UniProtKB/Swiss-Prot annotation:
One of its GO terms (biological process) is negative regulation of transcription by RNA polymerase II. Keywords: Isopeptide bond, Metal-binding, Nucleus, Repeat, Transcription, Transcription regulation, Ubl conjugation, Zinc, Zinc-finger. This is Zinc finger MYM-type protein 5. There is a cross-link at residues 59, 137, 195, 408, 427, 517 (Glycyl lysine isopeptide (Lys-Gly) (interchain with G-Cter in SUMO2)). InterPro entries: TRASH_dom, Znf_MYM, ZnF_MYMT-QRICH1. It comes from the Eukaryota. Its main location: nucleus. Functions as a transcriptional regulator. GO terms for cellular component: nucleus. The gene is Zmym5. One of its GO terms (molecular function) is zinc ion binding. Residues 1-23, 91-123, 405-429 are annotated as: Disordered.
Length: 627
């Protein structure tokens, strides 16, 4: 290799050589350093030539801040006349040719002589198989602005020059990437490096999302009934958690009146010097009418009327049936609504724990089927019911005592009145009428007449009054109060006593009857008494009544409490047998029918409570039926 370089030196006159690597790579670097020669020390021979060296930096240069000395090995630099400019391009990104497992870097040296000389090209191959230099294709190393040692470049696999201690080369200037110096041709633009995309090798499997109750934080099982308040994203496992979680958020409304346009009328309050009130109290006292109006609106929007008790208060439960929302104020109203409409919940009556249909204990309590998850919940529920019944008994006793005192005072006043009247029969009849009216105004006259010993005069007057008016009143009451059980014979408008009579007697459904056919051959069938629920189960229609006198059907709830011109509500009934199935299914889901059913169940429960109070008035113990 030294002989080859010697031939290059003796190839004629002062030359300027360009050393470059010929390769076909996708990555080039355009970081350029311009280096010019400086005067050596006095003891060294002067260098008349001023050279500019251009190095194409590679990614394996020394880090910034390290200085190295470059000494040229050409002997004829001192014999050169004039100032010649030499450009040297060094690049270590050459392609490697593989030949028998050995890598080589072909390097071309191109020499230029003075004007008129032809350029000659010599190919020099340097084997670099034994070198430990590593090449990286994914990134470009930092640019070295310091001095470069040519011998280090040869050791890295490029070229070798003889070190000449008499030559001194220093750095003159450095330029960043993709920048061109005036008067010097820069290298070709560098192709952009391909970006390496890093992808995770192993993606973590997605975990199944657990849905929990917002109140008790218990996980909801698959298939479990979840409760959700309208307008809220929280889910609950039971109605107890739903009602105890939080209050309903305030309704957002649009401001109708702008605060700037509204007249601000404030009352100026000057607190006395000795006042101990805070400034906040005086500030609240001087609110504008607009702010007062806004506070009243918020209070109105947070309250609504319950469909069961008809009270205006906070809504704790909302039930949506066919886009109709029914609002309930408490758990008691919700339970009453559920029992009235036959809603079945798969949860324990005591702890509200979810239970599948095939599990749990079913117990009949006060004529109603209750479900419990375990025997402990059933015992606790029994204790609660017994405590409530004892409380009701005490309240009944208190009311009875008050009623007895009022009747005692009435008897004393009537006794004095009968003593003063003497033998006048007309006054006796008037006094007996007064006593009768007072007895009718009492809550329960039948039970009290057996326990109370009336005076002789009052008893005689009442007996004579009953004997005289007994027959006439009984006939009139039977005609006006007691309608027949056939809904076709009921009057158009029913009074309260007639409604109570029909609710107590519960008109039966006609079965095993030869229903007549109409002109089209259609007739009523007993299958209309049942219906198919959305879950596939069969449900009953206890409100559907057939009238044999008019050959039509009626709705018991809507006939007693309904209003309007519905066919199932009016006095003629419905006899459209061809479309009856569609009419009944539509009537089941109507808002009017649901409201009337609630009224019917409420009246029936009130009547049952009155009868229970009358029967349990003389008993000291509490009796509950458990099977």
């Amino acid at each position: 290799m030294e002989a080859h370089l010697a031939d290059m030196e003796s190839s004629g006159g002062p030359t300027s050589s360009l050393a470059g690597t010929s390769r076909n790579t996708h990555v080039e670097d355009d970081d350029v350093v311009f280096i010019e020669s400086v005067q050596p020390p006095i003891c060294a021979p002067a260098i008349p030539n001023e050279r500019n060296f251009v190095f194409a930096s590679s990614k394996h240069e020394n880090p910034p801040g390290t200085d190295s000395t470059i000494s040229p090995s050409w002997r004829d630099l001192t014999s050169q006349k004039g100032n010649l400019c030499e450009t040297i391009v060094i690049d270590d990104e050459g392609d490697t040719d593989t030949n028998g497992g050995e890598e080589k870097n072909p390097t071309d040296f191109i020499e230029w002589g003075p004007n008129g000389n032809k350029s000659s090209t010599k190919n020099v191959d340097f084997p670099i198989a034994s070198l430990s230099r590593s090449k990286t294709k994914t990134a470009v190393g930092p640019f070295n602005p310091g001095r470069i040692d040519v011998t280090d470049a040869f050791q890295n696999g490029r070229f070798a020059v003889h070190h000449n201690p008499d030559s001194w080369i220093s750095q003159s200037a450095s330029f960043p990437r993709n920048q061109k110096q005036q008067g010097v041709d820069s290298l070709s633009p560098v192709a952009s490096l391909p970006k390496q995309i890093f992808q995770p090798s192993n993606q973590q499997p997605t975990k199944p999302v657990k849905v929990t109750c917002a109140n008790c934080k218990k996980p909801l099982q698959k298939g479990q009934t979840a409760y959700q308040r309208k307008g809220s994203a929280h889910l609950f496992c039971s109605t107890t958690c739903l009602s105890s979680f939080s209050h309903k958020r305030t309704r957002k409304t649009r401001n109708v009146m702008c605060k700037k346009d509204s007249p601000v009328r404030t009352t100026t309050i000057v607190p006395p010097v000795e006042s101990s009130k805070s400034l906040q109290g005086f500030y609240n006292a001087s609110l504008s009418p607009y702010e007062n109006c806004q506070s009243l609106r918020k209070e109105v929007f947070t309250k609504s009327r319950c469909i069961i008790c008809n009270k205006l208060g906070e809504v704790r439960h909302e039930i949506s049936v066919n886009s109709i929302t029914h609002k309930l104020c408490s758990n008691n109203c919700f339970n009453e609504y559920r029992l009235t409409n036959g809603l079945i919940m798969n949860c324990c009556e005591q702890c509200s724990k979810y239970m599948p249909k095939s599990t749990g204990h079913s117990i009949l309590i006060t004529g109603q089927q209750k479900r419990f998850c375990c025997q402990n919940c059933a015992d606790e529920y029994k204790e609660i019911m017994e405590a409530k019944s004892k409380l009701l008994l005490l309240q009944n006793r208190k009311r009875n005592a008050i009623r007895e005192e009022n009747e005692k005072r009435l008897r004393e006043s009537s006794g004095t009145l009968s003593g003063n009247t003497g033998d006048i029969p007309e006054k006796k009849e008037k006094s007996s009428e007064i006593i009768k009216v007072a007895a009718d105004c009492s809550l329960d006259t039948s039970s009290e007449e057996q326990n109370v010993n009336l005076p002789c005069s009052v008893a005689v007057i009442s007996d004579t009054f009953k004997e005289q008016l007994g027959d006439k009143n009984s006939e009139e009451l039977d005609m006006s109060i007691l309608p027949s059980l056939d809904p076709g014979s009921w009057p158009r408008i029913l009074n309260m006593k007639q409604r109570e009579f029909l609710v107590k007697n519960n008109p039966p459904q006609i079965r095993n009857f030869n229903f007549p056919k109409d002109s089209a051959g259609k007739k009523f069938s007993e299958t209309y008494y049942t219906r198919i629920l959305p879950n596939g189960e069969k449900g009953t229609r206890p409100w559907l009544l057939y009238s044999a006198s008019k050959d039509s059907v009626f709705c018991l709830y809507c006939r007693l409490f309904g209003e309007g011109k519905n066919q199932l509500r009016n006095e003629n009934g419905c006899k459209d047998w061809h479309h009856l199935s569609h009419l009944l299914s539509k009537h089941d889901e109507s808002e009017m029918h649901i409201n009337n059913s609630v009224k019917y169940s409420k009246l029936k429960s009130d009547l049952e409570n009155k009868t229970n109070e009358a029967t349990e008035g003389g008993e000291d113990c509490v009796q509950l039926l458990y099977t």
